[in-house]
């Protein structure tokens, strides 16, 4: 993937800040839980922004948060356009970020591997190698 245009990267970061502040201060939807905007990806022409988000809670609460984000999308778009003084405010698409779930599965796999290593180490204590104590030939020995 090419490195993004520095202006587009800066604009994406500004959009993330504006949306996060607006969600915290202006959106009063009770379905909106504790939401974190983790990343914003902006197209090269700055017309479409994909906002990745995470939220804490049960599946039902997260579904409510998703619905609240969708219903606030228009207000958030106009706020982004006004605060950043953009001629064209980008369309906002909210996508739930799967990073926390992925990190959890990786942590679980690492914990299983560590437990397996500990079990192997426990079993190998006091074990003797198969064959002779020193299986290598030495030059001082007769053949």
UniProtKB/Swiss-Prot annotation:
Chief localization: cytoplasm
Localisation: Cytoplasm
Annotated GO MF terms: ribosomal small subunit binding
Biological process per Gene Ontology, one example term: maturation of SSU-rRNA
Gene Ontology CC entries for this record: cytosol
Segments of this protein annotated with the region Disordered: 117-143
Function field: One of several proteins that assist in the late maturation steps of the functional core of the 30S ribosomal subunit. Associates with free 30S ribosomal subunits (but not with 30S subunits that are part of 70S ribosomes or polysomes). Required for efficient processing of 16S rRNA. May interact with the 5'-terminal helix region of 16S rRNA.
Protein name: Ribosome-binding factor A
Taxonomic path: Bacteria, Bacillati, Actinomycetota, Actinomycetes, Propionibacteriales
Gene: rbfA
């Amino acid at each position: 993937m090419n490195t993004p245009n520095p202006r587009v990267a800066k604009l994406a970061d500004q959009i993330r800040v504006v949306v996060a502040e607006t969600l915290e201060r202006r959106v009063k939807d009770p379905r909106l839980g504790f939401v974190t905007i983790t990343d914003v990806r902006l197209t090269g022409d700055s017309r479409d922004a994909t906002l990745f988000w995470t939220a804490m809670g049960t599946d039902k609460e997260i579904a409510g948060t998703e619905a609240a984000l969708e219903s606030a999308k228009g207000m958030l778009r106009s706020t982004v356009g006004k605060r950043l003084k953009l001629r064209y405010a980008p369309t906002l698409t909210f996508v739930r970020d799967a990073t926390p779930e992925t990190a959890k599965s990786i942590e679980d796999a690492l914990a299983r591997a560590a437990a397996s290593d500990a079990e192997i180490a426990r079993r190998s204590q006091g074990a003797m190698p198969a064959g002779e104590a020193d299986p290598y030939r030495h030059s001082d020995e007769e053949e």
